[in-house]
A protein has these predicted regions:
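Rhodanese-like catalytic fold shared by cysteine-dependent sulfurtransferases
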Residues: 2-57, 64-95, 104-141
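Short, surface-exposed ligand- or partner-binding patches at beta-edge/loop junctions that are enriched
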Residues: 99-100
Length: 141
């Protein structure tokens, strides 16, 4: 008797590979129109490679006081609470790297920017906390 509820092994392999590729495609450089979270190490590489590109902007979405206490060198501060009011001042064709303390606020900003038509928005996974944990540079002031 044939078990009609069991998937053939080949179908399982194809399904697994498809899901794996879909997940891996959510990183920069894979042509994904909806980029998402990137590691602090990848963010540091991106900053190094794009530092001279005027269309590349690092945005710290924490409060002014949090920003002053320590931020990624070259970042600008736009508090997540006011970003919706300031989004028209940003170029939707630019490349943005956003972060907050741990990822909560930047996730909301990431969604807001994507919904507003920004196509190149990257979010640092774990925020500046993860950045600092990896020993990456922080500016004060």
């Amino acid at each position: 008797m044939v078990d009609n509820h069991r998937l053939p092994p080949l179908v399982l392999v194809v399904l697994s590979l498809t899901l794996t590729c879909a997940c891996l495609g959510n990183t920069p450089g894979h042509g994904d129109p909806n980029p998402g979270l990137i590691s602090p190490a990848l963010a540091a590489t991106m900053i190094e490679e794009m530092r001279d590109d005027p269309g590349f902007v690092i945005i710290d979405v924490r409060t002014v006081d949090e920003f002053a206490a320590g931020h990624i060198p070259g970042a600008i501060n736009i508090d997540s609470a006011t970003l919706a009011e300031q989004i028209d001042n940003l170029d939707p064709n630019g490349t943005y790297l956003i972060y907050c303390r741990r990822g909560g606020r930047s996730a909301g900003v990431h969604s807001l920017m994507r919904e507003a038509g920004f196509s190149e928005v990257y979010e640092i996974e774990g925020g500046i906390s993860a950045w600092q944990a990896e020993g990456l540079p922080v500016a004060v002031g």
